[in-house]
């Protein structure tokens, strides 16, 4: 589903930060200012957003994994929801240092969480004392909160999508270090450096955040659907091209 300029305006994607907090590297994407607030040029944002979505579609069509990152209060819920809809991993609580660069260690925690889930399913809590069961539940809850969204990721993702690149600087740095492409919403108070697909826009409004996140989830689902369609058409095409030659 394509996003329009009107939708971006209605979601407030054009509202940047206070002019005194600006990052000069965002100057090419700033239209001007009103009441000491920078206004982002949506004529720049829209094509850049479309370009990012094109990349997302291609990646999804090739069965790539995109990790959604958004741990701020206004993005947590919608991010987890939309990543789930797209069948992608996500980080909606604190970013743990080394989540990408030290994935081996993270894998150990994922295994622990999965083992605990399996044990609970098998009725292990019933054999524990009240105190043991409480400790078990507490640990499991803590693990679920920090790594529940990435427990099925399997390895380093093919790309990461970040809402508010300044707030998630560690995630961006880790992705850059590993050469993992970054799709990022960049507000007027942050730098677009290190972001492969820059989406200049408001990263604080829950309406704006919902628009970006839904857009990425839609692009993933479209990419997958297109890939399936191509396989079906290729199979059909193969049937059409086969012509039996009569002998004699």
UniProtKB/Swiss-Prot annotation:
Gene3D superfamilies recorded: Glucose-6-phosphate isomerase like protein, domain 1 (3.40.50.10490), Helix hairpin bin (1.10.287.610)
Keyword Glycoprotein applies: no
GO biological process: translation
InterPro entries according to UniProt: Ribosomal_uS2, Ribosomal_uS2_bac/mit/plastid, Ribosomal_uS2_flav_dom_sf
An example Gene Ontology molecular-function term: structural constituent of ribosome
Cellular component annotations (GO), alphabetically ordered: cytosolic small ribosomal subunit
Keyword vocabulary terms for this entry: Ribonucleoprotein, Ribosomal protein
Family from the record: Belongs to the universal ribosomal protein uS2 family.
HAMAP family with a match to the protein in the record: Ribosomal_uS2_B
Protein name per the record: Small ribosomal subunit protein uS2
Organism, as annotated: Cupriavidus necator (strain ATCC 17699 / DSM 428 / KCTC 22496 / NCIMB 10442 / H16 / Stanier 337) (Ralstonia eutropha)
Originating gene: rpsB
